[in-house]
Structures are given as C-alpha cells and as structure tokens.
A protein has these predicted regions:
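C-terminal "capping" alpha-helix adjacent to the active site of nucleotide-linked donor transferases
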Residues: 82-107, 138
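A charged, aromatic-enriched C-terminal amphipathic alpha-helix characteristic of glycosyltransferases
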Residues: 103-142
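Short hydrophobic beta-strand element within catalytic cores of glycosyltransferases
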Residues: 51-54, 61-68
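Active-site donor-sugar recognition loop in glycosyltransferases
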Residues: 27, 44-47, 69
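Short acidic/histidine- and often glycine-rich active-site loop of Leloir-type glycosyltransferases
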Residues: 66-82
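Nucleotide-activated donor-binding/catalytic signature segment of Leloir-type glycosyltransferases, i.e.
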Residues: 4-30, 80-84
C-alpha cells in the first residue's frame, strides 16, 4: 500500500497487482498492522515527525530521509541503523536499502524499536520528562 495525502491523484499511474495506491486515510493504525515497512521520503518541514514516531511505536522497519529522521536518528541504536532503520536521501540510497532488506526476511515488529519508542517518545515518557522538570525546578516531589 502507498498511503499519503494527495497520492490519490496518481493512483491510476502507479496502481497495479503489487502496488496499491490508497492516498489519504483518516487513521493509519489498520495499515501499520499489515505493513512490512514504512517509507517516509520527506524533503522539508519543521521539527520531529509524528509519522516517524508512530512507525517506531509499531516496531516497523523504517526508510526515511534525513528530514523524516530529524531528532530520531541520533537515538536509534547503532546496531539497528542500516538493518531496521535506514537513512536515505537519494534514489541510490533507497535502492541500496531495498537491496539490503531483500537479503533476509523482514521482521514486521521489531521489539527494540518499540522499547525505544516507549522509553523516549511515548505519552508515559513525556510525562516522566515533565515530572522531572517540575521536580527539579520547584523542589517538589510529585
């Protein structure tokens, strides 16, 4: 499946037996459960990307540009870089990533990525960060 706002405009051009262009959807959760990987070739935007965090939360293999991995790449364990999470900024880098992925079976749910998400990006992680800030600035234990 190829999902993303505006892609329904090119559905006829790319849709075939192996590629299903969906376009915009209200919720990605259904698609994450079936997806082998998430590809996010973003070229501009500001700040950390929610879709990247969402893909990591599902433990999905991720291919993304420097832009889509902004704020995440540094936290990805080195042993997952180039194996489960790929930084690709050129067509050649995406092709190299696909060739590397083709060498072994795809893990549809990487537990290390899910743990990383839980530790750094989840609602609970945000709560703990804010709690720590409040406790350190006020001296009050929550």
């Amino acid at each position: 499946w190829v999902i993303g706002k505006g892609l329904e405009k090119v559905r006829d051009e790319f849709d075939d037996d192996d590629i299903h262009v969906i376009g915009f959807v209200d919720s990605l959760s259904e698609y994450y459960s079936y997806a082998d990987m998430v590809i996010a070739p973003l070229t501009d935007g500001g700040g950390m990307k929610i879709k990247t965090a969402e893909a990591i939360s599902y433990g999905k293999m991720f291919l993304g540009s420097s832009e889509s991995l902004y704020g995440y790449w540094e936290e990805i364990p080195d042993d997952l870089k180039g194996k489960v999470v790929f930084k690709c900024d050129t067509a050649e880098e995406y092709l190299n990533a696909f060739n590397k992925i083709d060498e072994k079976p795809i893990c549809k749910k990487n537990e290390e990525l899910i743990t990383l998400y839980d530790r750094l990006y989840s609602e609970n992680a945000a709560y703990n960060i804010m709690k720590d800030i409040v406790e350190k600035t006020t001296g009050v234990k929550l």
